[in-house]
């Protein structure tokens, strides 16, 4: 990722960094508008996801997570910014005239060729079933259900590892540290998702975060007691509890939020690491 730093004219631009090698004018037949309503609200209008709201209008890019153009070579034509995810996307021109977007693999450049199928080379950007991959392969965009498309390891810099194959299942170590079983017939893409340093990029000012649809985060200790369990007191006061709590009074640290007796519990060999 080529970082461009601005000349130091104001405090906001002095600390701002952007990528100077990524274009952002998508193809018209691969985008569509979407009505973004709610901004963190549920059907009753109650906030269920805090710190969301505002943001610039977005056009959704149709991403090919299935990679079902089998045994047809494609060439990377552009690397583009996608406002709907922190990973970059790249436009692929296939040999039969088809044009699709895929997630940008780390290290891929314009002019590289990719292909998907059953007996394709183990090369960055190629998609193939887990049964055809050697152990230790770094992968992303992994299917959970055969034919549904990739659902795991799709964020910027995400990478999973194929560590075992036994019977009808393959064992993967996911970016979260979780170790779980997946059907060997499911497909995945070789390599790591690009834009690895996205978490090190400085936005420079509060307005840049507002454009992304992220609202300010206020500490509970500076609120009133009616708004947060940590609120109230004279001056700078402690929270007044043995343990921190959420705005709704539940334990804030260490509480498990996963649903009990979920269908996939039998497939998870090791919980994700905090």
UniProtKB/Swiss-Prot annotation:
Record keywords, A-Z: Chloroplast, Plastid, Ribonucleoprotein, Ribosomal protein
SUPFAM superfamilies: Nucleic acid-binding proteins, Translation proteins SH3-like domain
Top-rank lineage group of the source organism: Eukaryota
One GO biological process term: mitochondrial translation
GO annotation, cellular component aspect: chloroplast; mitochondrial large ribosomal subunit
Gene Ontology MF terms in the entry: rRNA binding; structural constituent of ribosome; transferase activity
Record flagged with keyword Chloroplast: yes
Annotated localization: Plastid, Chloroplast
Stretch list, region Disordered: 224-274
The keyword Nucleotidyltransferase appears for this protein: no
InterPro entries according to UniProt: NA-bd_OB-fold (IPR012340), Rib_uL2_dom2 (IPR014722), Ribosomal_uL2 (IPR002171), Ribosomal_uL2_bac/org-type (IPR005880), Ribosomal_uL2_C (IPR022669), Ribosomal_uL2_CS (IPR022671), Ribosomal_uL2_dom3 (IPR014726), Ribosomal_uL2_RNA-bd_dom (IPR022666)
PANTHER family the record matches: LARGE RIBOSOMAL SUBUNIT PROTEIN UL2M, RIBOSOMAL PROTEIN L2
Family note: Belongs to the universal ribosomal protein uL2 family.
Assembly description: Part of the 50S ribosomal subunit.
The protein's name in its UniProt record: Large ribosomal subunit protein uL2cz/uL2cy
Protein species of origin: Carica papaya
